[in-house]
Design a protein with these regions (language model features):
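C-terminal-biased regions
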Residues: 1-30, 44-134
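Short helix-adjacent coil turns
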Residues: 31, 35-42
Length: 134
C-alpha cells in the first residue's frame, strides 16, 4: 500500500462523473414527461441539452479513466489495471469511499443506458403515432 499517491484526484473525477450522469438522468426524466405530453418544441430543446450533457459525461469519463491510469502508473501498476486493484493499493480508510463511488458510477451508467433506450422507444412510438395520424 502506497499512501504517497494522492487519491483525491480520483475521488474528484468520480464525483464529477456522478454529478454529470445524475444531470443526464434528470434531463431524461424531463424528456419522458415531455414525450408523453407530445410537446415537440420542448423535446427539441431537451434533445440539445441531452447531447451537451452526453459530451460532458464523455469528458468526465475520460477524466476518471485518466486519473485511474495516472494512479496506476504512480503505484507502478499496469495502465490497464482494474479499479479494484488500484483501490487496494490506497490506504485502507479510503477503500469504502472509492468502492462506493465506482459502484455508483456503474449503477448510474446502467440506469442512464436504460433511460436512453426507453426514451428512444418513446420517441419512435411518438413519431409513428404522429405520422399515422397525418
Amino acid at each position: 500500500m502506497d499512501s504517497n499517491v494522492n487519491w483525491d484526484q480520483l475521488v474528484d473525477a468520480l464525483r464529477d462523473e456522478l454529478q454529470e450522469k445524475g444531470g443526464l438522468i434528470r434531463l431524461l426524466n424531463q424528456q419522458t414527461e415531455t414525450l408523453y405530453r407530445r410537446d415537440i418544441i420542448e423535446n427539441e430543446r431537451l434533445e440539445e441539452q441531452i447531447r451537451t450533457q452526453l459530451r460532458l459525461i464523455s469528458r468526465c469519463t475520460q477524466g476518471r479513466e485518466f486519473a485511474l491510469r495516472q494512479a496506476a502508473a504512480k503505484l507502478e501498476l499496469n495502465e490497464d489495471v482494474q479499479s479494484h486493484d488500484v483501490i487496494r493499493r490506497f490506504p485502507e480508510y479510503v477503500h469504502p469511499l472509492l468502492e462506493a463511488l465506482f459502484s455508483e458510477v456503474d449503477r448510474l451508467s446502467n440506469r442512464m443506458e436504460e433511460r436512453l433506450k426507453q426514451n428512444q422507444g418513446l420517441k419512435e412510438r411518438f413519431i409513428f403515432e404522429t405520422s399515422s395520424t397525418v
